A protein has these predicted regions:
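A common structural junction motif
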Residues: 130, 206-211, 247-255
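Short, small-residue-enriched loops and turns at beta-alpha junctions
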Residues: 14-15, 41-46, 73-76, 129-130, ...
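Active-site C-terminal subdomain of aminotransferase-like
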Residues: 62-65, 72, 77-182, 189, ...
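Active-site phosphate-binding strand-loop segment of PLP-dependent enzymes
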Residues: 7, 11-67
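Conserved PLP-binding catalytic core of the aspartate aminotransferase-like
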Residues: 153, 157-208, 217-224, 231-233, ...
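Pyridoxal 5′-phosphate
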Residues: 10-14, 27, 31, 35-39, ...
Length: 270
């Protein structure tokens, strides 16, 4: 929606970002305006982290503001759960911090933390905000309470990391490909058609009581499937063991061709 000139750098590639910053710096020198670098704190599909320490280090060479979408990092990353910026020790160098109430806060809605003048500008000029409804009071009160819990009950976050590490290490030990995640987001990469992927997800939900989301082409290459698991602090190590076993079972069935490669699930039979 922005009319601004856009430069795209290769995912998490700092040399690519540097080149784009050089181009952007030359551009704004002739047109005026400023530079805004945008990244995720935790990338929602693969679970890897944006290199916020390396990005903010470039501020010593280039004049730009940094916007971090930390939907998956807020509440889980950093010593106090303040997010990926805190994890890297550069939270004070993030100019616009975006978070959501829909992940760690188990609600809905979102927020932007920034300087007051920028916040006021967004409030009155951002298209998605102009005619939006306010959050309901129960949601606001619930978010405040959950924020208090995040701050006063660090054991919940510690339990979450225990569960996440157990799940990820267990999946890898059983030969599962979970990519390069180093966050709570736990992707499991499999090979198969979209139809097979739909049946795997259906099988997990109906026969193993495991709900997970599926990501298919064009988000990932054709012939690949990404099943995304999100552990919580309410899960137990027994849940983890059960999940690992279930994924091993469906992966074996997929490899044997037991899921139909072409026919989609007949919704009338669900």
């Amino acid at each position: 929606l922005s009319p601004a000139k856009r430069y795209v750098y290769v995912h998490n590639d700092m040399s690519s970002l540097r080149k784009q910053l050089e181009h952007a710096t030359k551009y704004v020198a002739t047109t005026g305006g400023g530079i805004l670098v945008v990244t995720e704190g935790v990338f929602g599909m693969a679970g890897d982290l944006g290199k916020l320490d390396e990005i903010t280090a470039l501020k010593s060479e280039f004049n730009f503001r940094l916007l971090v979408d930390d939907a998956h990092g807020f509440g889980t990353m950093g010593p106090t759960g303040a997010g990926t910026g805190e994890h890297f020790g550069v939270q004070d160098k993030v100019d616009l911090y975006f978070g959501t109430f829909a992940k760690a806060m188990a609600g809905f809605g979102a927020f932007v933390a920034t300087d007051e003048d920028v916040c006021m500008s967004l409030r009155y000029t951002m298209r998605s905000q102009m005619f939006a409804k306010s959050l309901t009071m129960p949601m606001v009160e619930g978010a405040i309470k959950r924020l208090e819990m995040l701050k006063s009950q660090p054991e919940r976050r510690e339990k979450l990391w225990t569960i996440a590490h157990a799940l990820q290490n267990g999946l890898k030990a059983d030969g599962m490909n979970i990519g390069i995640t180093n966050s709570m987001v736990t992707p499991v990469y499999l090979s198969g058609s979209v139809a097979e992927g739909m049946q795997v997800v259906f099988d997990l939900r109906e026969n193993y009581n495991i709900f997970c989301s599926i990501v298919v082409y064009p988000v990932i290459p054709k012939g690949q499937l990404l099943l995304r698991l999100i552990p919580t602090s309410m899960h137990t190590l027994e849940d983890v063991k059960y999940t690992i076993k279930a994924f091993k079972n469906v992966a074996e069935k997929l490899a044997k061709g037991e899921y139909n490669k072409e026919l989609l699930i007949d919704a009338s039979k669900l």
